[in-house]
């Protein structure tokens, strides 16, 4: 069974834990309890393949930012979460993405942009803004509500699909490099 290491990142209070707990335990946690770091595991079937999701729910608080490099090194894919009623959390996505790329030393890291709290009426981040940002990054965008469960499975499953595509691409690139080495002739 394939295991996928997923990391949920985003600013404080955007609903990272609520999304993760909704996926794992099928219920909404409405009291806010800031996370330092929690790990969850769940077996799921995605596109006919049984797989194990190893999900790291991270701290949004700036005082825990030193821990980020460590979990970013081990993560295979990242849910970059903002709250649709918090423009600052949306603006912070750029910093998380840059840190992930720096730590992974790659421009091509599997990510999904997630706009959480879409059931709330007080939207400050327009859907088109988020779609445009995701398009500029070349990553999928999904709106979610941890409260109603809307888009929750879709967000995590889409990230797994992005990781699969990335692994496929990397193995094809590796094969191309190997093939080109065998075609070299020295005269």
UniProtKB/Swiss-Prot annotation:
Q: Which residues bind GTP?
A: 10-18, 29-35, 59-60, 116-119
Q: Where is this motif: Effector region?
A: 32-40
- Please summarize the record's notes on activators and inhibitors of this protein: Alternates between an inactive form bound to GDP and an active form bound to GTP. Activated by a guanine nucleotide-exchange factor (GEF) and inactivated by a GTPase-activating protein (GAP).
Q: Does the keyword Nucleotide-binding apply?
A: yes
Concerning CDD domains, the annotation shows:
H_N_K_Ras_like
Functional summary from the UniProt entry: Ras proteins bind GDP/GTP and possess intrinsic GTPase activity. Plays an important role in the regulation of cell proliferation.
Disordered as annotated region, ranges? 168-187
Q: State the EC number(s).
A: 3.6.5.2
Source organism of this protein record: Xenopus laevis (African clawed frog)
Q: Where is the lipid attached (S-farnesyl cysteine)?
A: 184
**InterPro entries xref list:** P-loop_NTPase, Small_GTP-bd, Small_GTPase, Small_GTPase_Ras-type
- What catalytic activity is recorded? GTP + H2O = GDP + phosphate + H(+)
Query: Tell me, which GO biological process terms does this entry list?
Result: Ras protein signal transduction
Q: Which residues form the propeptide?
A: 185-187
- By its UniProt entry, which SMART domains does this protein fall under? RAB, RAS, RHO
Q: What is this protein called?
A: GTPase KRas
Q: Which residues carry this modification: Cysteine methyl ester?
A: 184
Identify the PROSITE patterns for this entry. Answer: RAS
- Tell me which SUPFAM superfamilies the record gives: P-loop containing nucleoside triphosphate hydrolases (SSF52540)
Question: Might you report a single GO cellular component term?
Answer: plasma membrane
What is its subcellular localisation? Cell membrane; Cytoplasm
Q: What are the entry keywords?
A: Cell membrane, Cytoplasm, GTP-binding, Hydrolase, Lipoprotein, Membrane, Methylation, Nucleotide-binding, Prenylation
Provide the taxonomic classification. Eukaryota, Metazoa, Chordata, Craniata, Vertebrata
Say which enzyme class the record assigns. Answer: hydrolase
Asked if the Swiss-Prot or TrEMBL record annotates the protein with the keyword Lipoprotein, the reply is yes
Family, per entry? Belongs to the small GTPase superfamily. Ras family.
GO MF annotation, one: GDP binding
Q: What membrane topology does the UniProt entry give? A: Lipid-anchor
């Amino acid at each position: 069974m394939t295991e996928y290491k997923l990391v949920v990142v985003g600013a404080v209070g955007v609903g990272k834990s609520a999304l993760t707990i909704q996926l794992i335990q099928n219920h909404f946690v409405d009291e806010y309890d800031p996370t330092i770091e929690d790990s969850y595991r769940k077996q799921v079937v995605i596109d006919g393949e049984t797989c194990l999701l190893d999900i790291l729910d991270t701290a949004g608080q700036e005082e825990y930012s030193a821990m980020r490099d460590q979990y970013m090194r081990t993560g295979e894919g990242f849910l970059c979460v903002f709250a649709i009623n918090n423009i600052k959390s949306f603006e912070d996505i750029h910093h998380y993405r840059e840190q992930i790329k720096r730590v992974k030393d790659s421009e091509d890291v599997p990510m999904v942009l997630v706009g959480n709290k879409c059931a709330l009426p007080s939207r400050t981040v327009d859907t088109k803004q988020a779609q445009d940002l995701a398009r500029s990054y070349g990553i999928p965008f999904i709106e979610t509500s941890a409260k109603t469960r809307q888009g929750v499975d879709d967000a995590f499953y889409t990230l797994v699909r992005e990781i699969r595509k990335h692994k496929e691409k990397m193995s094809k690139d590796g094969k191309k490099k190997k093939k080109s080495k065998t075609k070299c002739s020295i005269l």
